């Protein structure tokens, strides 16, 4: 089967900034596609768990102005706990996958289908920040339900950075339990054979 690249519609505005929720003094990446740092008390909690990301102490500016920093870090925590998480919805009419890719630019995402599988790829080219050089990539694969036409797969990217890939489910033929039985008319000649036919002719004379 040939490979097909799925174009996605861009719902983000021209002023979209992938770093809008990042703390201005720190732009580090972790294992969940690249995320901002967390407050000290959250860092201690996550450091004692199985959290895979890198964390560091709260910046001094945030300590001096906790009321200002709290909303930004609250949004950051929400994104960090959900970033990279995908959701699959399968109804009678549609099959849909939603994937959080809010830290990838549109030109860093690729969606394609091959052999009944949807493949989503994101890649950051190597870039430099105040901490050094960083690059990041990911690949997610999803098997299409049986009967789904790969050419009908579409995708869109929301302003919040959610990539949605969906396809219509095949329509099943409507089966009815009602059966109409035709009625066949048979004459006496057919019922009695040749002798019955002669008897009918004699009676007619």
Curated annotation (Swiss-Prot):
Outcome reported for the amino acid change (mutating residue 34 to R): In HMND3; increased aggregation; increased homooligomerization; changed function in chaperone-mediated protein folding
Effect of residue 99 to M: In HMND3; decreased homooligomerization; decreased heterooligomerization with HSPB6; no effect on phosphorylation by MAPKAPK2; decreased function in chaperone-mediated protein folding
Location of the region described as Interaction with TGFB1I1 in the Swiss-Prot/TrEMBL record: 70-205
Chief localization: cytoplasm
Location of Phosphothreonine modifications: 174
An individual GO BP term: negative regulation of protein kinase C signaling
GO cellular component labels: axon cytoplasm; cornified envelope; cytoplasm; cytoskeleton; cytosol; extracellular exosome; extracellular space; focal adhesion
SS bonds (residue pairs): none
Domain sHSP, residue spans: 76-184
Consequence the record notes for mutating residue 53 to D: In HMND3; no effect on dimerization; no effect on cytoplasmic location; no effect on dimerization
Result for mutant: residue 128 to R: In HMND3; uncertain significance; no effect on dimerization; no effect on cytoplasmic location; no effect on dimerization
UniProt note on tissues of expression: Detected in all tissues tested: skeletal muscle, heart, aorta, large intestine, small intestine, stomach, esophagus, bladder, adrenal gland, thyroid, pancreas, testis, adipose tissue, kidney, liver, spleen, cerebral cortex, blood serum and cerebrospinal fluid. Highest levels are found in the heart and in tissues composed of striated and smooth muscle.
Keywords: Acetylation, Chaperone, Charcot-Marie-Tooth disease, Cytoplasm, Cytoskeleton, Disease variant, Host-virus interaction, Methylation, Neurodegeneration, Neuropathy, Nucleus, Phosphoprotein, Stress response
Recorded consequence of changing residue 136 to L: In CMT2F and HMND3
Post-translational modification: Phosphorylated upon exposure to protein kinase C activators and heat shock. Phosphorylation by MAPKAPK2 and MAPKAPK3 in response to stress dissociates HSPB1 from large small heat-shock protein (sHsps) oligomers and impairs its chaperone activity and ability to protect against oxidative stress effectively. Phosphorylation by MAPKAPK5 in response to PKA stimulation induces F-actin rearrangement.
GO molecular function: identical protein binding; protein folding chaperone; protein homodimerization activity; protein kinase binding; protein kinase C binding; protein kinase C inhibitor activity; RNA binding; RNA polymerase II-specific DNA-binding transcription factor binding
UniProt keyword annotation of Hydrolase present: no
Consequence of changing residue 127 to W: In HMND3; decreased homodimerization; increased client proteins binding; increased function in chaperone-mediated protein folding; alters CDK5-mediated phosphorylation of neurofilament proteins and indirectly impairs their anterograde axonal transport
Disease: Charcot-Marie-Tooth disease, axonal, type 2F: A dominant axonal form of Charcot-Marie-Tooth disease, a disorder of the peripheral nervous system, characterized by progressive weakness and atrophy, initially of the peroneal muscles and later of the distal muscles of the arms. Charcot-Marie-Tooth disease is classified in two main groups on the basis of electrophysiologic properties and histopathology: primary peripheral demyelinating neuropathies (designated CMT1 when they are dominantly inherited) and primary peripheral axonal neuropathies (CMT2). Neuronopathy, distal hereditary motor, autosomal dominant 3: A form of distal hereditary motor neuronopathy, a heterogeneous group of neuromuscular disorders caused by selective degeneration of motor neurons in the anterior horn of the spinal cord, without sensory deficit in the posterior horn. The overall clinical picture consists of a classical distal muscular atrophy syndrome in the legs without clinical sensory loss. The disease starts with weakness and wasting of distal muscles of the anterior tibial and peroneal compartments of the legs.
Function: Small heat shock protein which functions as a molecular chaperone probably maintaining denatured proteins in a folding-competent state. Plays a role in stress resistance and actin organization. Through its molecular chaperone activity may regulate numerous biological processes including the phosphorylation and the axonal transport of neurofilament proteins.
Family affiliation: Belongs to the small heat shock protein (HSP20) family.
Name under which the protein is recorded: Heat shock protein beta-1
Organism: Homo sapiens (Human)
Lineage, uppermost ranks: Eukaryota, Metazoa, Chordata, Craniata, Vertebrata
């Amino acid at each position: 089967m040939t490979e097909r690249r799925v174009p996605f519609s861009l719902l983000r505005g021209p002023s979209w900034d992938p770093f809008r929720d990042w703390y201005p003094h720190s732009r580090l990446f972790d294992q969940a596609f690249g995320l901002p740092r967390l407050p000290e008390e959250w860092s201690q909690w996550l450091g004692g768990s199985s959290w895979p990301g890198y964390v560091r102490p709260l910046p001094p500016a945030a300590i001096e102005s906790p009321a200002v920093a709290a909303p930004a870090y609250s949004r950051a925590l929400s994104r960090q706990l959900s970033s990279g998480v995908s959701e699959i919805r399968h109804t009678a009419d549609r099959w849909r996958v939603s994937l959080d890719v809010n830290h990838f630019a549109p030109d860093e995402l690729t969606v394609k289908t091959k052999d009944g599988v949807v493949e989503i790829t994101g890649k950051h080219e190597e870039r430099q920040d105040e901490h050094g050089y960083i690059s990041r990539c990911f690949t997610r694969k999803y098997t299409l339900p049986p009967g789904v036409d790969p050419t009908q797969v579409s995708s869109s990217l929301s302003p919040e950075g959610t990539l949605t890939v969906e396809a219509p489910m095949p329509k099943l033929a409507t089966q009815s339990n009602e059966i109409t039985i035709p009625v066949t008319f048979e004459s006496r000649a057919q019922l009695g054979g040749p002798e019955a036919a002669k008897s009918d002719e004699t009676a007619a004379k």
